[in-house]
From Swiss-Prot:
GO terms for molecular function: ATP binding; pantothenate kinase activity. The keyword Cytoplasm applies. The keyword Cytoplasm applies. The gene is coaX. Transmembrane segments: none annotated. It catalyses: (R)-pantothenate + ATP = (R)-4'-phosphopantothenate + ADP + H(+). The lineage of its organism: Bacteria, Pseudomonadati, Pseudomonadota, Betaproteobacteria, Burkholderiales. It comes from Polaromonas naphthalenivorans (strain CJ2). GO terms for biological process: coenzyme A biosynthetic process. It is found in: Cytoplasm. Its EC number is 2.7.1.33. Homodimer. Pathway: Cofactor biosynthesis; coenzyme A biosynthesis; CoA from (R)-pantothenate: step 1/5. This is Type III pantothenate kinase. InterPro entries: ATPase_NBD, Type_III_PanK. HAMAP family: Pantothen_kinase_3.
Length: 255
């Protein structure tokens, strides 16, 4: 019973095929494509792939993208299922004012992070940081309640905003420096410090609220670039959303 997991973000679609819809399943294949190339998945990445027994995904890119992805899966006689944020799932309680409005990728990543800690016997507050097109920082207490989170622009959005609103800032990407002495480094360092500072503020908030410092788990396409500049210790987990999808699938697709 193979299982196909999908993470459809704002920029790329990432997929992973496992030998079963269970936690700890063996990874058989995986890949990623930019959204402009998803109409060729059936003839490229998924060509010749055995038909999965179950498909589960999360999508934040909108209904039009979801329909295009669904069309590519018509090569199989399997109906894909999509995660929608709910009041409770897999041991987590959703503290959002309107739970269904929470981005499904944020919800799935939190489920993956929470169970990653539980598997190691850790019951502590947790921050989940996703660094991609946008940056999100989610706070979860030791009981598994999502307390709330923040959203801020990713590096690319910050730079484009400055370029469009300020004359003379069309410069190459720079490096992160403690004291930048050129515009390229100043822009790159400013964006990096803004993200790192937001995470530190959330660490302070949850530490004050829960009475102990949190574990910090970071994921996303730009997480590896951000990690060296963080002021707090973070654990980098590339597969966090897939881990969350496996946790959900193990409950939804029971034999």
């Amino acid at each position: 019973m193979t299982f196909l997991a999908l993470d459809v973000g704002n920029t790329r679609l990432k997929w992973a095929q496992y030998d079963a819809p269970v936690v700890g399943a063996k990874l058989l294949a995986h890949g990623a494509v930019f959204l402009e190339n998803i109409d060729r998945l059936a003839e490229n990445d998924w060509h010749g792939m055995p038909e999965p027994s179950a498909i589960l995904g999360c999508v934040v890119a909108g209904d039009a993208i979801k329909r295009r992805v669904a069309e590519q899966m018509e090569i199989w006689d399997v109906l894909p299922r999509w995660v929608h944020s709910s009041p409770q799932e897999a041991g987590l309680t959703n503290g959002y004012d309107h739970p269904a409005r929470l981005g499904s990728d944020r919800w799935v990543a939190m489920i993956g992070a929470y169970h990653r800690l539980l598997a190691r016997g850790i019951r502590k507050p947790c921050l989940v940081v996703m660094v991609g097109t946008a940056v999100t920082v989610e706070a979860i207490d030791a009981s598994g309640k999502f307390l709330g989170g923040i959203i801020l622009p990713g590096h690319g959005i910050m730079l484009r905003a400055l370029e469009s609103g300020t004359a003379g800032l069309h410069v190459p990407t720079g490096d992160v420096r403690d004291f930048p002495t050129n515009t390229s480094d100043a822009l790159t360092s400013g964006g990096t410090f803004a993200i790192a500072g937001a995470v530190q503020r959330m660490v302070d908030n949850i530490t004050r609220h829960c009475g102990e410092a949190p574990e910090c788990i970071m994921t996303g396409g730009a997480a590896w670039k951000m990690a060296p500049s963080m002021s707090v210790k973070v654990e980098l987990v590339e597969t966090l959303i897939f881990d969350g999808l496996l946790e959900i699938a193990s409950r939804r697709f029971k034999p």
